[in-house]
């Protein structure tokens, strides 16, 4: 499955309990179509103690969400946007904001 966002992209959540939150993509999982976004979809994980190294605790961490629930966030428009792919004169591909023309 192809994902429209990449690692280190700034995205905004468009549906679900975290609707409206923005964050950076920490990791993308193309096989499952999910992304891990910083500060979004926080879950509590019960961590088991290891031999003298780590104490048992309840840790809050990000869980992956479906990539269809996020859109790329354009810093110039200050809005969620769709992207188009454009080939420059030197042959390199860039992603372009459909609203303002800013490159990512």
Curated annotation (Swiss-Prot):
SMART domains given in the database record: KOW
Source organism superkingdom: Bacteria
UniProt keyword annotation of Ribonucleoprotein present: yes
GO CC annotation terms, alphabetical: ribonucleoprotein complex; ribosome
CDD domains: KOW_RPL26
GO biological process: translation
Keyword annotations of the record: Ribonucleoprotein, Ribosomal protein, RNA-binding, rRNA-binding
Function: One of two assembly initiator proteins, it binds directly to the 5'-end of the 23S rRNA, where it nucleates assembly of the 50S subunit. One of the proteins that surrounds the polypeptide exit tunnel on the outside of the subunit.
Similarity comment: Belongs to the universal ribosomal protein uL24 family.
Subunit structure: Part of the 50S ribosomal subunit.
Name this protein carries in UniProt: Large ribosomal subunit protein uL24
